[in-house]
Amino acid sequence: MCSSDLNAVIEALRAGTTIDKIFIQKGETDKTLGHIASTARAAGVVVVDADKRKLDFMSRTHAHQGVIALTSVREYVSVEDILNIAREKGENPLIVVCDEISDPHNLGAIIRTAECAGAHGVVIPKRRSAGLTSIVAKTSAGAVSYVPVARVPNIPALLEQLQKEGVWVFGTAAEGTSDLYSADLKGPAAIVIGSEGDGMTRLVREKCDFLVSIPMKGKISSLNASAAAAILLYEAVRQRLGQ
């Protein structure tokens, strides 16, 4: 949801409402906006300086007061919560890690596929990523209500945490060291999906245990992020059904 009223944003912060990001107009010296920014940062909310044109576009009606807050459609969980869900089911964890997926339609489609494939959760970064917005919820066809989503400040650190928990990390890359069908996805697995434009970031790539490629037989050399996620998830499903 999108809120552009000063008092509504202040009350949302005071109430502890889960806020994805707060956009504040560049150059504004209003004390209330300054208070919102400092309170939000203290609460761990991402604050973005934006020009008036961007805020006008986001608010549609141009009726913002120099601030727009994007609130989540549901609460985020912790990574430990996701691991515990797998433990309670007696299953090897299957987790999707999104590395800077900024397109909400892609994120929604990934969450939808994760739900259908029985993944235990999805992880996104706080910055340079779409959050659990209404667009993501709509694109997911309601899957955001069922798939636990964790939000972390640092994806490389997250991957190290998962590895310490015995989870193997599989990154997707056109120049992967092995093809998808040689990868063993039956064990505890985290599948990392990079952004559609740039793929995985360098630090994330370096933390992966395996880099796998999807065989491409046509003239186009890449798939969009949600399609790549679907292929890897259902290869994991196929392998696990055959155990």
Give residue spans per PLM region.
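Short basic, glycine-rich beta-strand/loop surfaces that mediate nucleic-acid
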Residues: M58-S72, A143, P148, V152, ...
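Structured adenosyl-cofactor binding patch, chiefly the S-adenosyl-L-methionine
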Residues: I10, C116, K138-A143, R202-Q243
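Short beta->alpha connector loops at strand-helix junctions that form conserved
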Residues: D51, S72, D99, P125-K126, ...
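Active-site/ligand-binding-proximal alpha/beta "capping" segment
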Residues: F170-N224
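N-terminal positively charged helical leader segments and presequences
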Residues: M1-I85
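RNA substrate-binding interface of SAM-dependent RNA methyltransferases
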Residues: N7, E11-T18, T29, G34, ...
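Active-site helix-initiating loop/hinge in glycosyltransferases
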Residues: D5, N106, S222-N224
